[in-house]
Amino acid sequence: MEKLRELLPKDQYEKIAAINNPYLHEFLAEWIEWLEPSKVFVCTDSPEDEEYVRWKALYYGEEKMLEIPKHTVHYDNYYDQARDKTNTKLLVPKGVELPFLNTMNREEGLKEIREIMKGIMRGKELFICFFVLGPTNSIFTIPAVQLTDSAYVAHSEFLLYRKGYEEFKRLGPTKNFFKFVHSAGELDERKTSKNLDKRRIYIDLLDETVYSANTQYGGNTIGLKKLAFRLTIQRAVKEGWLSEHMFLMRVNGPNGRKTYFTGAYPSMCGKTSTAMIPWENIVGDDLVFIKNVDGIARAVNVEIGVFGIIEGVNQKDDPIIWKVLHSPVEIIFSNVLVKDGKPYWNGMGIEIPDEGENHSGKWWRGKRDAEGKEIPPSHKNARFTVRLEAFPNLDREALNNPCGVEVGGMIFGGRDPDTWPPVREAFDWEHGVITMGASLESETTAATLGKEGVRAFNPMSILDFLSVHIGDYIRNYLEFGRKLKKTPKIFAVNYFLRENGRWLNEKLDKAVWLKWMELRVHNDVDAIETPIGYIPRYEDLKVLFKQVLNKDYSREDYEKQFKIRVPELLAKIERIWKIYEPIDNIPEELFKQLKDERERLLKAKAEFGDYISPFTLEKRI
């Protein structure tokens, strides 16, 4: 504490002294001394401290005001627009091998990042902020402390997470907290990170600390988001619960029944549009914790806000998000085009000005970058950051419930033109975890240009964020389900089937699949058994299409969408098998499930041929 007394002005020192936690004090003293900021501000949970951070983001030029009250814009460096996968490394002890993951020797990594960060905050203000992941004072709560010299990063976290200063005071001397140290480094005249050659995001799994330097882009800097996610996955696998890259939503069933679903979809597979269906309710759009509470799987949203991709958001397809983005609620727009105080983005469905300011500086239509590429009005990864409370379809009770909500179903959303049917249900937990979750693929969206895209393997949509061996991750999933008294049903969806280049489904058909899944969770409708799980009966979907979308649904459409495509399904099993086969430590159950599914498909092929009509299988029941 003496060291902190020397380093901090009296008013800021008193805020830290009120937290009785020597581990925290030691960490802060070490890093304040090392970073050498000219000024330190400690954020409590007071509205005044949050307002101070908001004001400093404008004062230091990291954000600018827009025309609508409470709206601001932030720009990242032209070359700092996405997660830096190359320089994001997991620091692991010598000899640890993690397939698919970008690892580095822990001692070397810590030495390098300390050198880069020595004195990096000279002439700058350090913000020390306290937050929690999950609801406060709950079995899901994980406290975290963020050190950053970016008021934009701190402001973003106030929109995305629950405040945690009082929680730190309540918890007292615990080591059970995450630590994030970030510096944007030297800034250029546009107030964006300058030294991108020294951009590093190092995740120390042993000490549950993340270091991030010379970057501002949210995915590299907002400690509690995807950086903390690596730490929570590791902790979940150690402790036997699930930390997942999933939405959490409520589907409204008959007679006021509420059923909650989680959903894991790789990008461009329909995750946000599913969670935002206007007549259902959102709890969260990105990260969930799922724990076994008295034999029931219960889930919480880790966050209280949305850090969403803005590209393509338009009034017709995204009425709720569109309305929020035009309301006077607190929003940070990043890397969009601004003209006369108004933000514009690609695909917004209205005319975009021919000039303005964007992530490249002064912009005009046809402007090219150093590589000769034409610069679009907004970056394809441009974002909006806003609290969930701004959404009229928010299920507030579920968001704030410290016990979480019961998970009725888990959805895995893939993207392919010719393999998975639009919706199906797993035979059981193990079958779903392996053949749906651990086999998830998404066709890269080059497909929309008429080229067949590459199928990217992305189990549980978590590959970019894994921090443990994939075998341990899958084993934990299987074990978690075995210990439940009541397991959630598992479903797989695919909104992107095509035939002769035409989509087989319309955008809103997914609303019908959700209602069918809700009925299946409660065993209200029968289903057809196929070699790959249960699919809907035509009669049930016909009723739902009329009820939900007021649409007629033809037998022909049903047959095209739900036929079992045996050759493509067998090819997929082959692909997935080849990915897992060379890796050590993969649970036996994975190969058994794939083998059993292959045998069921071959048997069906021998009886019915390569392409099997759902009506043929229904007759057999």
UniProtKB/Swiss-Prot annotation:
Location of this chain's protein in the cell: Cytoplasm
Example GO BP: cellular response to glucose stimulus
Keyword Transferase: no
Residues binding substrate: R83, Y217, G218, G219, S267, N381, A382, R383
Pathway: Carbohydrate biosynthesis; gluconeogenesis
Stored Pfam families: PEPCK_GTP, PEPCK_N
Gene Ontology molecular function, alphabetical: GTP binding; manganese ion binding; phosphoenolpyruvate carboxykinase (GTP) activity
Alphabetic keyword roster: Cytoplasm, Decarboxylase, Gluconeogenesis, GTP-binding, Lyase, Manganese, Metal-binding, Nucleotide-binding
An example Gene Ontology CC term for this record: cytosol
Residues involved in GTP binding: M268, C269, G270, K271, T272, S273, R383, R415
Cofactor(s) needed for function: Mn(2+)
Residues the record marks as active site: C269
Binding-site positions, Mn(2+): K226, H245, D286
Family of the protein in this entry: Belongs to the phosphoenolpyruvate carboxykinase [GTP] family.
HAMAP family: PEPCK_GTP (MF_00452)
Protein name per the record: Phosphoenolpyruvate carboxykinase [GTP]
Protein's organism: Pyrococcus horikoshii (strain ATCC 700860 / DSM 12428 / JCM 9974 / NBRC 100139 / OT-3)
Name of the gene encoding the protein in the UniProt record: pckG
